[in-house]
Each structure stands twice: as structure tokens, then as C-alpha cells.
Design a protein with these regions (language model features):
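Nucleotidyltransferase catalytic core that binds NTPs
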Residues: 1-188
Length: 188
């Protein structure tokens, strides 16, 4: 029986905290194929700080994720035909019997409920498993405490030092500034 592991997330904007989700996705896959999908969420509602919670479109998230995490470049997928998690599950049903979804704690329960509801209706898998990539510790420093909300706030207030703390070492300072500018323009 063939198995695939997928991660689905907003990554808006990508942060060092997202590497944990990618690492868990790879670890869960073992030798099986795995893919990481940034959602197509863009613009939309405002967060608690009054900023749009999805400042980057999917193609830019893909670009930045690939640049930030080159070890996963071939696993990070930008596919304009996949705009919902249902479409993601439909994509793999012909080639795989089993699928595992890796998601962050903030969306995990919603995804479990939705994906389970639509099995044998919109798509069919013999087994669907779920992996929670973990809960963020808002008080922790570094990747454990990093959130896209913190990054959006740092960008909006032009706090380049704070924004830089949320970036991996693979990103050079000029790229960090470029990403921050993109986030700022998407927040409005």
C-alpha cells in the first residue's frame, strides 16, 4: 500500500517556526513521498492588531519558503489548481491508499474534522492519519515561540530587528528586508 504525507498551512509570512512543521513532515514520511503546500489564503480578515492576516499570495509564499528552506525546495509545492484541502486530498487519491496530514496546532482540529467528514465522499483513502506539528509557546524565544502574527506586527511597525529574529540563517539581510516590504504592502 502506498502512502503520502502532506503538510498544509498558511505560512503568512513564513518564519523560522515553520521549519518545525517541515521537519516533522519529513520525519513522518520516513521514506515515503512528502509535500508541503502553502494555502492560497490572501488578504481577508484582519488579525487582533488590525492587519490583514494573509499579506502574501501563494506564489510569493512558495518563493520565500523555497529560499528560506532550500533543503525542502523540491517538496514545497505551488499548484494553482489546489486552493482547498479537499482539492489537495483529491489530487493524491488515485496514486495513494493512505495519506497523512501534518498541520500546526492552531488549525489541527478543524482539519481533522473536515478531512474525516469528506473521506468516501469527495475523495477515498483506506487510511487517513493526522500529525499535530505542535503548539507554539508564545513566551518562548526563537522558533518555539515564533508566530506569523508576531512577524506581521514587526513588519507593520518596521521593526527590522524583531522581523529578522523570525528568519532562518539561510536568508540574507537584503532578502529579509525585501520580504518585510512585501509583507508590509500586503497588510494594508
Amino acid at each position: 500500500m502506498k502512502r503520502v504525507v502532506v503538510a498544509w498551512g498558511r505560512f503568512n509570512p513564513p518564519t523560522i517556526g515553520h521549519q518545525k512543521l517541515m521537519d516533522i513532515t519529513k520525519q513522518t514520511a520516513g521514506g515515503d513521498p512528502f509535500f508541503i503546500y502553502p494555502t492560497h489564503s490572501f488578504g481577508g480578515k484582519k488579525d487582533d492588531n488590525g492587519f490583514k492576516s494573509n499579506p502574501l499570495p501563494a506564489d510569493r509564499k512558495h518563493f520565500w519558503l523555497s529560499k528560506m528552506f532550500p533543503q525542502y525546495r523540491n517538496n514545497i509545492i505551488y499548484d494553482t489548481s489546489i486552493k482547498t484541502i479537499i482539492q489537495l486530498f483529491q489530487k493524491y487519491q488515485a496514486d495513494y491508499d493512505d495519506i497523512v496530514l501534518v498541520a500546526g496546532d492552531d488549525q489541527y482540529n478543524d482539519y481533522v474534522r473536515m478531512v474525516t467528514t469528506y473521506n468516501n465522499k469527495e475523495y477515498t483513502y483506506r487510511n487517513i492519519d493526522f500529525v499535530n506539528a505542535g503548539k507554539r509557546d508564545k513566551k518562548a524565544a526563537g522558533a518555539e515561540g515564533m508566530s506569523a502574527t508576531k512577524m506581521r506586527y514587526a513588519a507593520a511597525t518596521m521593526a527590522i530587528g524583531e522581523f529578522s529574529l523570525g528568519m532562518p540563517k539561510t536568508l540574507k539581510e537584503d532578502d529579509i528586508i525585501k520580504l518585510m516590504v512585501e509583507v508590509v504592502s500586503g497588510l494594508k
